Amino acid sequence: MEIFKLLRKDRKMLFLMFIGTVSFLFIFIPFLKFQMIGSSHKINAYPSLSAVCGLLLGPIYGFFAVMLVTLIYFFLNPKAFYFGIYSLIPPTLAVISAGALSEGKWKYSAIILIVGLLLFYLTDVGRVAFYYPYLSTLALLLILIFREKISKLLFSKDWKKMIVGATILSFSSVMTDHLYGSILGIVYLHLPAEDYISVIPLFIKERLIMTVIGAFFVIFAIEISKCFLKNATKLKEKLLKSYIDKEIKINCKNMLNVDEELLKKYNVKIPSEEEQKEILKTLVEVVVFNNDKDENR
């Protein structure tokens, strides 16, 4: 179950999550910086936060959160943004990619990376340092291989599967940010191919560190949400109702293709929407009860 997608349906929870994420971004962004290639500027590790931001808020609200924080920092200290206003592009695309991927909409994440790779190879630097974005290519391959399974891995009970899902989510968002940042370095700062080639060992280390940090935040957010939901009875009931309503709507659409004459012939009755809701509610409650029972053993 996509916990955060359901949580966002509650306006109060959405507001709290949005404010909490924005505050978290403000606190974390000034720390953990890396030297930028071909420049005296330093890169801070905000790409580590793209995955958890996209996970918590989704692609749309995550986009607005990152945009808000980045714009405020831009107006406070524009010199720190070495690509000018275009510095907004990498983090926003990274959080959109992470948000889409966490909801099982892997095609959007794949498209963002494919477009970035095409843009990179259209440049002179891309044709010379053609092997430079191989980690971004690896991220794309992971998305194409795992697809919607990434979302399922994230919310798996098996902690090993959760780590795999969190790592893929973090790695793909970090490499999306890196790819578009590299393109801006070519277009905006006119960095030569030699700079990109010479820095390959350094950026591998940087991005892997960011991936690990990002995966940690993702796992932490999921575990905290599970503990919270376990003890929030009213919210759990509201989310359960929302989930059931969604499932019933899908089932009702599928039932439009049922042959009514065939049902009458064999005296088969399809339960009403309310009856289906009660049945599904009972089943979900039994499953939740058994899960809680197993965890307490």
UniProtKB/Swiss-Prot annotation:
Keywords: Cell membrane, Membrane, Transmembrane, Transmembrane helix
Cellular location(s): Cell membrane
Superkingdom assignment: Archaea
Keyword Transmembrane helix part of the UniProt annotation: yes
Main location: membrane
Annotated Gene Ontology cellular component terms: plasma membrane
Regions crossing the membrane: 14-34, 55-75, 81-101, 110-130, 135-155, 163-183, 208-228
Record's bilayer topology term: Multi-pass membrane protein
Name of this protein: Uncharacterized protein MJ0923
Organism field: Methanocaldococcus jannaschii (strain ATCC 43067 / DSM 2661 / JAL-1 / JCM 10045 / NBRC 100440)
